[in-house]
Amino acid sequence: MKEFIGGKDVISRIMEAYGFANRRLLAEHLGMPHSTFGTWAKRGFFPAELVIRCVSETGARLDYVAYGNEPIFDNSDDLKYFHTIKLESGKSFIVENKPFLLPYLPNLDSRESYDKVFRIDEDNHTYFATSDYGNLVDGEYFVIVENSHLIRYITVLPAGKIRVDGGKFSFECELSDIDVVGKVILKMEKM
């Protein structure tokens, strides 16, 4: 039976699976104090719950995250790092690219189509959106309204109008009144 050895090594593997360069960024993503990692490393603690979460969110192999047995992912051809935007209070910030397995995304026309997909992190939601969405149809979109960057549900109305829902207030406007950046193709929520 393999032994779970905790501490610094397992934390480093978790950081690598998520694609973070330092513990502070990982802690921010996980919503925990970064000093926790220092305590775990010093005491040789094995963070089993975090290992399971990492495997679930990144698609990394359990054998790698828990024990360090390469490779990190089953099929590296299916792993892609996506440009990532963090939304906070209507403002957007570009953060480190984050990995995700392509089989978990909806099928697109071609593998090249995934180059137009980007990731959006907002509170406890993660969205994947594509800038190649063709004609506007009802659905969730990443939009800019009056310099606020938002995820909103758009309904197409007659006469070139749209209805924007999802905030405190819904409103109708011309499509040209807002900027549509991308259509959401996958939405995930952290429980």
UniProtKB/Swiss-Prot annotation:
Any single GO BP term: negative regulation of DNA-templated transcription
Database matches in Pfam families: Phage_CI_C, Phage_CI_repr
Gene3D superfamilies linked: lambda repressor-like DNA-binding domains (1.10.260.40), Umud Fragment, subunit A (2.10.109.10)
Keywords: DNA-binding, Repressor, Transcription, Transcription regulation
InterPro entries (UniProt xref): Lambda_DNA-bd_dom_sf (IPR010982), Phage_CI_C (IPR032499), Phage_CI_N (IPR010744)
Any GO molecular function: DNA binding
Family listed: Belongs to the CI repressor protein family.
Function in brief: Repressor of lysogeny.
Protein name: Repressor protein CI
Name of the coding gene: CI
